[in-house]
Swiss-Prot record:
Record-level GO BP terms: proton transmembrane transport
Gene: kefB
Gene3D superfamilies noted in UniProt: 1.20.1530.20, NAD(P)-binding Rossmann-like Domain
Protein name listed in UniProt: Glutathione-regulated potassium-efflux system protein KefB
Domain RCK N-terminal: 400-519
Keyword tags: Antiport, Cell inner membrane, Cell membrane, Ion transport, Membrane, Potassium, Potassium transport, Transmembrane, Transmembrane helix, Transport
SUBUNIT field: Interacts with the regulatory subunit KefG.
């Protein structure tokens, strides 16, 4: 692809994403499906703007590579060791059982046994990019089903190596015999990467961070991710596995959060590019000529994988409410199928349209997953949003709540417990199904689902409630919910959690005056105690705390985001001088009346 063509392709990708994803979100089908549909539209079987799909698909795999690096940063070796049973137990069982069943079914459709084995293994793999994206959207990361799903995906990445090695053996063209010297060199290179990463990465990043230039740190992070991906690709191993290992090696370093911040924007764009590329690869010609075969294949593929995953989740002891989420989110074919089937085709394992049919099946199965997860959500809503159980009635004597609490993480739990302790009738909206199960055991009235859905808010009693407390983790969800409440439930008193000053500004601009910055009050209290330990009288420290809070809130209201940076800096300096003057006056006054104050805490 020439430079001008590459630039044109980039513009088309961005336009497709900007046009399709917001529309898909408004239709309620999710961003992932929006990307896939955008790819179909601009691909060779749609409007035909882009024809070189294979090259773009290979490049777009970098989205998965960046995603795996960030996941590696969230784990450390000890955490990975704790997951060994689920990785090598459930993960291995899923790959083996799904491969065997799918290979058997392919043999019934006139595939040779060698092609059926390769087809079964390829179809048994799930899409790492899609599954992890959906797990984050559904709040599954903290749940047992999310941890188990990640373990299965990690084993599938590990299984890439033997699967690719199996293809030439099945084709009978394994270069007469294995070149054990070459294999040994690859193993040594892999071990060298592990040892080098373990002892060299931290000193290197420490040296780069000492320069104080943020752009260089970002460049070094990109170099690490892309370099480890290319190194693993040169060894014939999974690029995603290489960056995952690099992430794990840096998970306990002091640069973990900075690395994640540097990579995150690239990850999002490249993941979108990956999904668009998958949509472009859908061969509508094959779909049209073999429509019945493809539809049956997609249904059978999804059904077999759901059955295997559900049974394994049950054997592993996953809660019944989480099994369908776990099975549904991993029910599609994955990006590895494109690599494996291309390798098998080069070895002449497939005949006629067999490879094209398998790839169409994989692509369509990926498109079914967002829709399937919506059905699972609706099923869970019916299961958990029904009438109250008998053991919950003593806690909720009146069906009409006084307060709705959205989100029940660490922040929301404190609020909920305080309200319950004071006999307030509350209803909780939570999207983490494991948290829903736990809260119901302790008598909370809980609705499962996305709080930005108006119907769910109505079911939870928003029309009768007096207040709503929004404690969402994501600022975007908070602002969307504020807008919905102001539009559909204007009588509600809105109280919200702000993660920092930026979110506080947004809430003020939206007309929400009752909010709490999650670290502000606790930091102020600790600061007051620090002043006392430094010799300041408790009364004086208390007054300093109150003055600081009052002045900070006034600054927050005055320094709206539209102001120029220089204006904000100037106003901040002026406020600091004003605060110093207040403190000095207070100190002079307190020296005259210290004895009139009882010891505070």
């Amino acid at each position: 692809m020439e430079g001008s063509d590459f630039l044109l392709a980039g513009v088309l990708f961005l336009f497709a994403a900007v046009a399709a994803v917001p529309l898909a979100s408004r239709l309620g089908i999710g961003a992932v499906l929006g990307y896939l549909l955008a790819g179909i539209a601009i691909g060779p079987w749609g409007l035909g703007f882009i024809s070189d799909v294979d090259e773009i698909l290979h490049f777009s795999e970098l989205g998965v590579v960046f995603l795996m690096f960030i996941i590696g940063l969230e784990l450390n070796p000890s955490k990975l060791w704790q997951l060994r049973r689920s990785i090598f137990g459930v993960g291995a069982a899923q790959v083996l059982l799904s491969s065997a069943l799918l290979a058997g079914l392919l043999m019934l459709t006139h595939f040779s046994w060698q092609a059926a084995v390769v087809g079964g293994i390829g179809l048994a793999m799930s899409s790492t990019a899609m599954a992890l994206q959906l797990m984050r959207e559904k709040g599954m990361n903290r749940s047992e089903s999310g941890q188990l799903g990640f373990s299965v995906l990690l084993f599938q990445d590990l299984a890439v190596i033997p699967a690719l090695a199996l293809v030439p053996l099945l084709a009978g063209s394994a270069d007469e015999h294995f070149d054990w010297m070459k294999i040994g060199m690859k193993v040594l290179a892999f071990v060298g990467m592990l040892i080098g990463g373990r002892y060299l990465l931290r000193p290197v990043f420490r040296f780069i961070a000492a320069s104080g230039v943020r752009e260089v740190f970002t460049a070094a992070t990109l170099l690490l991710v892309l370099g480890s991906a290319l190194f693993m690709d040169a060894l014939g191993l999974s690029m995603a596995l290489g960056t995952f290992i690099a992430g794990v090696l840096l998970a306990e370093s002091e640069y973990r959060h900075e690395l994640e911040t540097a990579i995150d924007p690239f990850k999002g764009l490249l993941l979108g590019l990956f999904f668009i590329s998958v949509g472009m690869s859908l061969n509508l010609g094959v779909l049209y000529t073999h429509l019945l075969w493809v539809v049956i294949s997609v249904v059978v593929l999804v059904a077999v994988k759901i059955l295997v995953l559900y049974l394994l989740a049950r054997l592993y002891g996953v809660r019944s409410s989480e099994r369908m989420q776990f099975a549904g989110v991993l029910s599609q074919g994955g990006e590895f199928a494109f690599v494996l089937f291309s390798t098998a085709s080069s070895q002449r394992l497939f005949q006629g349209d067999q490879m094209a049919l398998l790839l169409v099946t994989v692509t369509l199965s990926m498109m079914t997953t967002p829709l399937l997860m919506k059905l699972v959500d609706k099923w869970l809503s019916r299961q958990f949003n029904g009438p109250e159980e008998e053991d919950e009635k003593p806690w909720v004597n009146d069906d009409k709540p006084q307060v709705i609490v959205v989100g029940f993480g660490r922040f929301g739990q404190v609020i909920g417990r305080l309200l319950m302790a004071n006999k307030m009738r509350i209803t909780v909206l939570e999207r983490d199904i494991s948290a829903v199960n736990l809260m119901r055991k302790y008598g909370y009235k809980v609705y499962y689902g996305d709080a930005t859905q108006v119907d769910l808010l109505r079911s939870a009693g928003a029309e009768a409630a007096e207040s709503i407390v929004i404690t969402c983790n994501e600022p975007e969800d908070t602002m969307k919910l504020v807008e919905i409440c102001q539009q559909h439930f204007p009588h509600l008193h809105i109280l919200a959690r702000a993660r920092g000053r930026v979110e506080a500004h947004e809430l003020l601009q939206a007309g929400v005056t009752q909010f709490s910055r999650e670290t502000f009050s606790s930091a102020l209290e600790l600061g007051r105690k620090t002043l006392v330990t430094l010799g300041m009288h408790p009364h004086q420290a208390q007054r300093a705390q109150l003055h600081f809070r009052r002045l900070d809130m006034r600054m927050l209201r005055e320094l709206i985001p539209m102001h120029a940076d220089t204006v904000q800096i100037s106003r901040a300096r002026e406020a600091r001088r004003e605060l110093e003057e207040i403190f000095q006056r207070e100190m002079q006054q307190e020296r005259r009346q210290l004895d009139g104050w009882d010891e505070f805490e």
